[in-house]
């Protein structure tokens, strides 16, 4: 028997979130800054990560991690075979989100890996707001969608939206599909995951 080095890394960068989703309680979990960038540098310097080809950045809201772009640099430094990186965002604060994502796009294009990012939508209009429990959630997310599509005209990266089926939005899948057809947006559909450790949502 010989252990095979991992090629996929799902990286939860933070439990900090500016949303209060009905299907996720990560915003209630104790937040701490976790590792410092230097500690991350030492961690990713381990041979365990040398053959990573795909990194999926997740969390609560990844763009709230102040060192997010620096962490991408660190991963690129230590993962010579890195081919693709993805990140999902709620898109609520357009200026912060676009600024962070554009910087990651620049790193990806400089280092030669593909970066893909998606704005999460749980429904159209009030349906999205009811699930995220954030004022004007849908309008704010769509503002970010439009800004990222404008950025796509200048820089190379993959972009779209993501929709997660939960008990609260079963009827919204079709509406999101029609919206994405109308707006010519790529969309990925998935089923909600439940984990007490990751999301605190087993209740």
What function would you assign to each model-found segment?
Residues 109-203:
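Radical SAM enzyme [4Fe-4S]-AdoMet core and its adjacent flexible, acidic
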Residues 1-115, 196-197:
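Conserved alpha-helical substructure of the radical SAM core
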């Amino acid at each position: 028997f010989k252990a095979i080095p991992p090629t996929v890394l799902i990286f939860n960068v933070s439990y900090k979130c500016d949303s209060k989703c009905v299907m996720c309680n990560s915003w209630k979990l104790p937040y701490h800054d976790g590792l410092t960038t230097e500690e991350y540098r030492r961690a990713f310097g381990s041979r365990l990560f040398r053959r990573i080809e795909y990194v999926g950045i997740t969390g609560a809201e990844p763009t709230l991690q102040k060192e997010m772009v620096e962490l991408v640099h660190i991963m690129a430094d230590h993962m010579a075979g890195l081919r693709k990186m993805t990140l999902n965002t709620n898109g609520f604060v357009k200026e912060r989100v676009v600024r962070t994502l554009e910087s990651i796009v620049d790193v990806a294009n400089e280092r030669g890996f593909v970066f893909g990012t998606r704005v999460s939508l749980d429904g159209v209009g009030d349906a999205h707001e009811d699930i995220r429990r954030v004022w004007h959630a849908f309008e704010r997310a769509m503002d970010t969608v439009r800004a990222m599509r404008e950025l796509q005209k200048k820089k190379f990266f993959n972009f779209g939206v993501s929709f997660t089926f939960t008990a609260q939005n079963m009827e919204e899948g079709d509406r999101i599909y029609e919206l994405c057809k109308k707006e010519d947006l790529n969309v990925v559909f998935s089923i909600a995951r439940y984990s007490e450790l990751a999301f605190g949502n087993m209740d």
